[in-house]
């Protein structure tokens, strides 16, 4: 057995471990298929018995034969039902368990995994690939058990009747083994490429569905059609290769069996001269019944190989290490003191570090603003606080304790994150505010959070209020409304540390007035990290850190940095000239004044 065959056997063996919890049901299905297969073998024996009886007994003495034949048919039917029904129960349970395990693993995987793998492939694995495994566990397994028993039963009968003649089947076994091994290897490789192409098509489709406005606005329809056409053509080519391999394999197998049966018939005419007519006909009947289960086993092998290829990709996901969570320290509510000591970080596969020797401290309740050009490392810093990525060097301390020492869930309980790209779910407004661990919040608490975030201003206009469905990712809401729901979620969480990552940069002036007013309540008595491009919104921060190429190049208050006439002063001057003082939202000025006070 070569390495590929061994790997395939190990994968299928691992797949069958999912059957173990349902071994009782599986045993019943095996019993049913044993009944089915037994009747196939007994049918050949019955033919022998009928012919011999016709030669030795009167017709009146054969009245039991129709009853015996009917009994075999009934047992055959009962066996078929029991085998199919209970194996179907096992297979649906296995697929359900595997699909849930894959989904649960997605919830445990680190952010770096999602960065490295596109969503289309990940979705295809939990839909299409699990479906391929279903075929391997259900139809193919059913065929292997049922037809395998039938083939074994017929071979036992043949060897019992005339073992010398039956050695013909032993002679062709090596040829069949080599053929099946070659075809299995080829089928598995092609199946994997077919599954990858389905993932690619899913990815392209998800992109055009999610970005249809951009596609239409920039005339990308033809480009997207070409992308999908190329992907679909590749899928078609691989699918045809798969079909061709299966189509050639079956006739070759039948040809080998036909040669063996022809030789067997020729030999039987000479070596079974002393046998009765019944023995001769019964033997040939069993021999000619044998190709059907062997052909079925050959076809089932195709489904098995496709299932193994699919299972391999699923097990790759399951074998991925989850987020590192070795910390044990827990606290009900931290004070909110954040300190960064000589922090450095480089993304996987990147040549340049994203952060270099970052050191600063945020006291409880302070507002720390991070500003600078895009790519300066501001968002990276926020991601490290949440432990979306493990930092390479240095320390991040929360209340004097290294964040890696905290239990991961407990650490994130202390943080509320609001991004520029708000994530909302295809659910009600209330369920989007009270999401995840916040689901236990009362109706009044949800309404209060929405009020404090100035979201009730638009929620009240809907007939169903907080129970209004907002569509996929909040498609029925404006940008400002979506942002206010994100702030309401942060308010409801009531975490001691708030991270605002470009929370207002994409909003119009009117929406920003609402958001800035809501931010005053959100940031009250919380340690806040504010990442902002609009410098007018962070003038009242306690400390402003100016970042450039992963380093802190300036730090101080707004007045101090303006007085330095350095990087911050130039950025501020550029924005002021570009937008003018009249474009600054009144609420932003109020926020600045309130923060300074």
Outline where the language-model segments fall:
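Short intracellular "coupling" helices and adjacent cytoplasmic loop segments at the cytosolic face
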Residues: 2-5, 92, 100-124, 128-130, ...
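Transmembrane helices of ABC transporter permease
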Residues: 21, 25-35, 69-72, 139-193, ...
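Hydrophobic alpha-helical transmembrane bundles that constitute the permease/transmembrane domains
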Residues: 34-42, 73-81, 133-136, 140-152, ...
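Helix-loop-helix
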Residues: 57-58, 157-171, 244-312, 317-318
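An intracellular "coupling" helix at the cytosolic face of ABC transporter transmembrane type-1 domains
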Residues: 21, 111-112, 128-137, 141, ...
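Transmembrane helix-loop-helix hairpins at lipid-water interfaces of multipass membrane proteins
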Residues: 26-79, 86, 159-164, 277
